[in-house]
């Protein structure tokens, strides 16, 4: 059958478009995709129903962490593939490019007061990765290495999706560290963040141990 012109495509409209893209635009897009660093807002309110699960927490969170930072999201076009491969691979020391990206993120972070120390969260999946990242940040940033915030032996497994039950499982999960002589902001490092409750509860442990109010969560990925 004979077709009729639709008037929309370049053949019908008589307009030809080139596939060429301005090199400056390509460079700008590539730079943006490869630039690490995203803000992670802290939790501001306790979940409803905490009293029903036996924890007397309600209202506004006053002892949580400050705004955190990650290299990127696992779904990102830029860093996403690299970070997924890193977290899916067997545990290993932090690769040079990931350490460099982390340092770049921290260098661009608007701190009122420079961090004085860095600490890693205990991990059952990436203890070597987190520990080596803490060591690298301590060396590059000349920060005090506080080691690892260790889990208690009797801690509950965190399996619930419900926020109240996640907080319940994380409550009293860590051994209170010795922060004697630490005066100033602390970087708290983990591999990945999802709900934000792990850092919220871990920050409370550091605050009870005498940490400065400015605890900066530092994740590899979200």
List each model region and its residues:
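C-terminal helicase lobe
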Residues: 1-23
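Active-site-facing substrate-recognition patch
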Residues: 19-117, 131, 135, 148-183
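A structural signal for isolated positions on well-ordered beta-strands in alpha/beta enzyme cores
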Residues: 117, 187, 216-218
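Short helix-loop-beta junction
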Residues: 135-144
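ATP-dependent adenylation/pyrophosphate-handling site
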Residues: 147-159, 209-222
């Amino acid at each position: 059958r004979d077709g009729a012109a639709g008037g929309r495509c370049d053949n019908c409209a008589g307009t030809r478009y080139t596939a060429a893209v301005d090199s400056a635009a390509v460079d700008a897009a590539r730079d943006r995709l490869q630039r690490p660093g995203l803000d992670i807002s802290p939790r501001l309110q306790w979940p409803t129903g905490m009293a029903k699960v036996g924890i007397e927490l309600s209202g506004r969170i006053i002892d949580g962490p400050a705004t955190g930072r990650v290299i990127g999201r696992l779904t990102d076009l830029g860093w996403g593939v690299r970070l997924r491969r890193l977290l899916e691979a067997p545990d290993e020391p932090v690769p040079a490019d990931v350490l460099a990206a982390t340092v770049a993120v921290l260098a661009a972070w608007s701190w009122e007061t420079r961090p004085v120390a860095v600490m890693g969260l205990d991990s059952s999946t990436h203890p070597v990765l987190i520990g080596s990242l803490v060591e690298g940040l301590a060396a590059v940033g000349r920060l005090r290495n506080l080691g690892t915030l260790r889990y208690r032996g009797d801690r509950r497994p965190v399996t619930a999706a419900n926020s109240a039950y996640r907080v319940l499982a994380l409550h009293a999960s860590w051994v209170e560290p010795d922060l004697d002589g630490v005066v100033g902001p602390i970087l708290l490092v983990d591999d990945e963040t999802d709900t934000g409750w792990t850092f919220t509860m871990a920050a409370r442990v550091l605050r009870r141990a005498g940490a400065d109010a400015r605890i900066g969560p530092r994740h590899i990925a979200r």
